[in-house]
Amino acid sequence: DVKAAIRYLRKDFANGDTYGIDPNTVFVGGSSAGAVTAIHLAYIDNVSDLPTTPFDIQAVANNLGGLEGDAGNMGYSSEVNGVISFAGGINTLSWIDANDEPLVSCQGDADQTVSYNCAPGLGQATVLELCGTGEMHPQADLVGVLNDKLVFPGADHSWCSSGNSSNFIQALDFTTDFLFPLLPCNNTTAITEVNSTQRKLLKITDVLGRVT
């Protein structure tokens, strides 16, 4: 469904651009299960990479249309340019490999829902293993993927449940600082002198849409 949503935005860009996006700069992210979804969307390359035990996830994926799914908007790319993880994790660390998308993560190191290191999700043996920030970023460093992490010492999984919490606000600012250099508009060599004199500054926002 997330891939279908990304395809929808690119389809909309090609048919009027209701949302004013840059189709070549799409970041995907979320918190908790949303972060887990975003991470796996970006880093799983083939259905054959998926586990078959204790659950046959390959069969599930194939029944739902493969990695691209069957939720529509086909013919448009679902590729992303970066991943944002608030308290998320990945099932298999080796899925993060060379030339993958940049990763920024924020997590408490006492998280028992999605382990900061590696453990079954929700702390239950019947749930697939998830490896959190403490393991994903050494893997990203190992294979040369651009990454950064913000760790909240002693914090559990609940810090990202409130958008007004000090940790959540800090995480937003940290994420903004990580993503900002990745935006194409920071490549000033792509702006000609003529174009720059014709542009008028209307307002300044950060990458999350907040007016600065």
Region locations from a protein language model:
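Extracytoplasmic/secreted proteins, especially bacterial periplasmic and envelope-associated proteins
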Residues: 1-4, 8, 36-40, 79, ...
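Primarily recognizes the serine-hydrolase "nucleophile elbow" in alpha/beta-hydrolase
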Residues: 4-99
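Hydrophobic anchor at the start of a short beta-strand
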Residues: 26, 103, 147-148
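Extracytoplasmic/secreted cell-surface and envelope-processing proteins
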Residues: 91-95, 113-116, 158-162
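Short beta-strand/loop motif that positions the catalytic acidic residue
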Residues: 105-107, 111
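Conserved alpha/beta-hydrolase "acid-adjacent" motif
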Residues: 112-132
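C-terminal catalytic histidine-bearing segment of alpha/beta-hydrolase fold enzymes
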Residues: 130, 134-187
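Residue-level detector of functionally pivotal "anchor" positions at catalytic/ligand-binding pockets or at interdomain
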Residues: 181-211
